[in-house]
C-alpha cells in the first residue's frame, strides 16, 4: 500500500492556487487499473508523525519529512539531491530502477543504526552551527560577511 502526502503549503502558493503535485498524481492514479489504484491513498492533511510510525518505508523528494522520520529512528529513502543526502543517515537514490531493485531484494533497512543516528546528530549540529547567527559580535561579523553589509550599517 502506498500513501502519498502532499506538501501542506502547496495549495497556498499564490502563483498556482491548487495542489499541483497532488492533482497530477491523482490524474496518473486514475489512469491505473483498479488493482493498482486501490493500493494508493493520496492525502493533504494527515499527521506526519502518525504516518511515519505506521509506515514500512519513508520515501521523499528532498523533503523535511525525511529528517523528521530519521528523528523517529526510521531510515528515510531520499530520491534526488537533498541537502541532507549522502550524510550517512539516508538511503540515497538517483535512479528509480536502482531503488526498486533494492526494494525488491529487501536491501533497505527500515531503521537507523546507532552509527547512522550519530551521523544524523552530527549533520544537524553542523547544519545549525552554519545556519544560526550568534547574538555576539562574532555573529554580527558573520552576518556582515554573508550579506556583504557595510560595517557602518550594523
Where are the predicted features?
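Catalytic donor nucleotide-activated moiety binding site of glycosyltransferases and closely related
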Residues: 1-44
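Low-complexity, flexible helical/coil segments
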Residues: 1-7, 37-44, 76-81, 94-99, ...
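Leloir-type glycosyltransferase catalytic cores
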Residues: 89-154
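Glycine-rich loops and low-complexity Gly/Arg-rich segments
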Residues: 26-30, 66-69, 83-86, 101-105, ...
